[in-house]
């Protein structure tokens, strides 16, 4: 894999070849599993009611576009916050996430990131926030390939 001018392989332009699929039942539409608004980490308040007694998904922005089954495989039954560790101002994220973890009874945390190196920063941020919170909450990281498959 070549590097772009900025040195980040995640910024490399690429075409993803797909064979055209035909849906068995084109009258059935996927149902959204989103249970809250807003979803951007910058916008969600730490005291939002959907974080209480919840499983939380913290997903990199690109994950929902890369993983076709995002709603059914990752989002279903979870509160969500999305962020981009490369493009967002992430300075407030560690403290904000720590506040979410401290102020709520969180059952589990799933971090969903892309396989590109710059996306790993989101996993690091969440782990630092969890440590800062003083809580012990089960944490899982899901790594999604740029071709749309789960890597782990």
PLM region spans:
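Iron-sulfur-associated redox domains of electron-transfer enzymes in respiratory
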Residues: 1-152
